């Protein structure tokens, strides 16, 4: 069982926000891409996105295009989007369905969906050429609770070891079985770290999110993960209908076999470095973050529901989606304003309050990951 402490107990006095360079420097951004995004396990979506053999998505990670595809054998694999002949990019559409092969549009080198080279015109005329020597370059891939993760590192930390702190933690929410009801994409003119720091505290909620603050008091927060790459805990839902929706009522059946206390809580966790996970009694929301520059972040947000909810009378996914779309946009707006202010020569790191202890803990995890001392 997890042990929760009040959010203020996770606070370490004296810590300040990060210096300006961490939000505006292209050099720091480059370090982040190489030391963090090219070395860590990153969420790239849901297994259900790749429902049939040949289904694929492209993801750009640390400047690299990666194909994530379901093979004819049903297994999901990831490969660099690079032909082994002369380096041509193989796929350009962000998602789609391939036939039984991937063919390079330049000289027609052809690969099976497991990356094996099976066609290379005229290469039989090259002495010693062996197609077995030229498979697509693989990218490490792992599945967890219905989510897919990739890692560009040559020798990545084993996924089970990296995610050990989360093993079984969310099993009661039946994450692997949940079904997507909506996905929304956002382009935010702010540094990716501001998004994480904002997610990690609700001190701003009464001012920025009056609708949210009416349904869950910002002082109700307790945390069970408050140091390291995974951080978070819960807040109490006080809405009479027991849900964070526009109506305040549940928009569908419970996502799992939840204890009584879970039916009145929303759990918020950040999974370093690119995932935010929000677990409600009647739905689960997750964000993935994709930094594009020191001041630009692409964010996807997806809402998951119990599979039996679809088609049921009274199922109202838009009640949740609209609530959080409004809340998301409030967050993105204030993060963009923070980005503008931090870019000023007048900016100096300010002190964190006891209500921002998880944001400060996230900063510590970030500094460790990039190899900088705090």
Report the location of each language-model feature.
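Non-catalytic, topology-defining segments of multipass membrane proteins
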Residues: 1-4, 15-16, 179, 372-373
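General detector of N-terminal leader/presequence modules that precede the first folded domain
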Residues: 1-8, 322
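Short, contiguous pre-domain boundary segments
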Residues: 6-20, 176
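Non-catalytic accessory segments flanking enzyme active sites
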Residues: 18, 22-61
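Soluble FAD-dependent oxygen oxidases
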Residues: 32, 64-66, 373
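Short Pro/Gly-enriched beta-strand edge/turn motifs at strand-loop
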Residues: 39-51, 120-124, 269-273
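Rieske [2Fe-2S] iron-sulfur-binding domain
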Residues: 49-154, 158-168
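C-terminal catalytic domain of Rieske-type non-heme iron oxygenases
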Residues: 75, 81, 142, 147-374
């Amino acid at each position: 069982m997890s042990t929760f402490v009040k959010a203020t107990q996770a606070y370490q006095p004296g810590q300040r926000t990060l210096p300006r360079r961490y939000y505006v420097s292209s050099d720091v951004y480059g370090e982040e891409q190489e030391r963090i995004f090219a070395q860590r396990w990153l969420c790239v979506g849901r297994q259900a996105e790749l429902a049939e053999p040949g289904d694929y998505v492209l993801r750009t990670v640390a400047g690299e295009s990666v194909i994530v595809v379901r093979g004819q054998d049903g297994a999901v694999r990831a490969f660099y989007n690079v032909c082994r002949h002369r380096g041509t990019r193989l796929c350009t559409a962000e998602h789609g369905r391939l036939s039984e092969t991937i063919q390079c549009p330049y000289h027609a080198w052809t690969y099976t969906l497991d990356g094996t080279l099976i066609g290379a015109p005229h290469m039989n005329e090259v002495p010693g050429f062996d197609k077995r020597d030229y498979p697509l370059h693989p990218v490490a891939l792992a599945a967890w609770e219905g989510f897919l993760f990739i890692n560009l590192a040559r020798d990545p930390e084993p996924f089970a070891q990296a995610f050990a702190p989360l093993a079984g933690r969310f099993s009661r929410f039946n994450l692997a079985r949940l079904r997507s009801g909506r996905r929304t994409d956002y382009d935010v003119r702010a540094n990716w770290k501001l998004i994480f720091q904002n997610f990690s505290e609700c001190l701003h909620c009464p001012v920025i999110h009056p609708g949210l603050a009416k349904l869950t008091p910002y002082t109700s927060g307790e945390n069970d993960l408050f140091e390291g790459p995974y951080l978070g805990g819960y807040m109490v839902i006080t809405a009479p209908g027991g849900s964070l929706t526009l109506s305040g009522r549940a928009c569908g059946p419970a996502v799992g076999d939840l204890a009584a206390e879970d039916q009145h809580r929303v759990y918020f966790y950040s999974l370093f470095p690119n995932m935010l996970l929000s677990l409600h009694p009647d739905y689960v929301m997750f964000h993935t973050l994709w930094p594009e520059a020191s001041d630009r972040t692409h964010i996807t947000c997806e809402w998951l529901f119990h599979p039996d909810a679809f088609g049921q009378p009274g199922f109202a996914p838009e009640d949740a989606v609209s609530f959080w779309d409004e809340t998301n946009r409030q967050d993105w707006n204030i993060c963009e304003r923070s980005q503008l202010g931090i870019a000023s020569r007048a900016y100096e790191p300010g002190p964190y309050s006891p209500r921002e202890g998880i944001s400060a803990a996230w900063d510590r995890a970030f500094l460790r990951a990039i190899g900088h001392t705090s």
